[in-house]
Design a protein with these regions (language model features):
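Short, basic/glycine-rich phosphate-binding loops at helix/coil junctions
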Residues: 50-66, 114, 156-158, 272-282
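ATP-binding N-lobe of GHMP and related small-molecule kinases
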Residues: 1-102, 106, 119-128, 133, ...
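Conserved, helical-rich catalytic subdomain that frames metal- and/or nucleotide-binding sites
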Residues: 169-313, 328-331, 338-341, 345-369
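DPxDG-like acidic metal-binding loop motif
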Residues: 73, 102-127, 145-150, 157, ...
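Glycine/serine-rich anion-binding loops at beta->alpha junctions
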Residues: 66, 93-122, 161-162, 312-327
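Solvent-exposed alpha-helices and their adjacent loops that cap or buttress functional pockets
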Residues: 34, 158-159, 165-168, 184-189, ...
Length: 369
């Protein structure tokens, strides 16, 4: 019977970017937060160890989704089979509901969902739970290797893509280096979220090139950026440990405030109580907003600064073009949705209402069948 797995979206609660490194990559510091919003990935697999046959077939309801080895779900399944020395005939179908290349980590989440589905289809998930399992067990004779231990799964996920490992944790997650070094943080309690998807494309490689030019213009060296990211990591750790970082409410360097003012009260969110939303920001906004002014305006509408329904936090997610706002109540979120109904600077925006997802809920809700 096919296995259906929810493939949840993520947003970034702040994203610090370092100067370009010698290897061409950039060090990052961010907090990922998973959402209820999801694709559905269906996996069908048959063990073909005896026949020594292996095949992967991928389909989707969205023609923009690659149906070959370029797809992260395909890569994840192929790497898992190779690493375990296993053989299987695998079919993957991605029911695409999340934006493609929108900054929500959809492709990376698809990869983890495909791995979870593959494990269940071939019975690897049951074997991994067996405390008596060893590398010399009979399962090893069937090509099922040691990679199913959590640390190995994270290594394989990182080999597929920078954002992939976070989806093996879920909830609220600290991401370091290129984003592939991940650590679970205490979950924020669920809050309402509006995801705004504009009909505007943002090229991530181009955004990084613009960032590199900005670093050069401002004289940000590799050493200075390393210090910047270390300080940001410590600040995140303090905030999620219940300490309030120093620094007051201010507009981000992109010029658009990320939250709407003093929301203190007996039912305040931990996002406000820790003070984290008063200082975190997404560095990509500094280079993306000047190129796409409509995105800055969408963030302004989501934040609704100075109003009773102001967001707890609003930001670009990843390099965009998707933006999001977090809200204390459903009513506040619905008002934000209403503000997105008309085109913004000539750009149509699709607004979606969802909620943030704790780690427990993430795993409890993942497998549908």
């Amino acid at each position: 019977m096919p296995t259906k797995v929810r493939s949840h979206a993520k947003v970034n609660l702040g994203l610090g970017i370092g100067a370009p490194r010698a290897d061409g990559f950039h060090a990052l510091t961010t907090v990922y937060q998973t959402l209820e919003l999801h694709d559905v990935v269906t996996v069908t697999a048959r063990n073909t160890w005896k026949e020594k046959k292996q095949s992967i077939r991928l389909t989707s309801n969205d023609e923009r989704v690659p149906a070959d080895g370029r797809n992260t779900a395909w890569k994840m399944v192929e790497l898992a089979l190779q690493d375990g020395g296993s053989y299987a005939e695998v079919e993957i179908h991605i029911d695409k509901r999340l934006p493609v290349q929108g900054g929500l980590g959809a492709g990376s989440a698809n990869a983890v969902a495909a791995l979870i589905g593959l494990e269940r289809e071939l019975g690897w998930n049951k074997q991994r739970r067996d405390p008596g399992w060893t590398a010399q067990s009979p399962w090893k004779e069937m090509g099922i290797g040691t990679f199913y231990w959590p640390s190995r799964r994270l290594e394989l996920a990182a080999a597929v893509g920078s954002d992939v490992p976070l989806f093996l944790i879920g909830g609220t997650v600290l991401g370091l280096d290129r984003g592939q070094e991940v650590y679970p943080l205490p979950d924020i309690e669920p809050v309402w979220c509006v995801v705004a998807t504009p009909e505007v494309g943002v090229s991530t490689p181009q955004a990084f090139r613009e960032w590199d030019a900005l670093c050069a213009a401002e004289g940000l060296t590799a050493e200075a950026s390393t210090d910047k990211l270390k300080k940001l990591s410590r600040a995140y750790a303090c905030a999620f440990a219940g300490e309030t970082p120093r620094g007051g409410h201010k507009a981000g360097s992109s010029g658009v405030p990320t939250l709407g003012g003093d929301r203190a009260g007996p039912q305040e969110s931990a996002l406000v109580r820790t003070g984290i939303t008063s200082w975190i920001e997404n560095d990509f906004e500094r280079v993306v907003f000047p190129q796409h002014p409509s995105l800055a305006e969408i963030k302004r509408l989501l934040a609704a600064s100075g109003t009773p329904e102001a967001a707890l936090y609003a930001s670009l997610s990843g390099s965009g073009s998707t933006l999001f706002g977090l809200y204390q109540t459903r009513g506040d979120a619905e008002k934000a949705l209403a503000r997105l109904e008309k085109p913004i600077e000539g750009v149509s925006v699709r607004g979606t209402l969802t909620r943030t997802l704790t780690r427990k809920a993430y795993w409890d809700e993942m497998v549908l069948t």
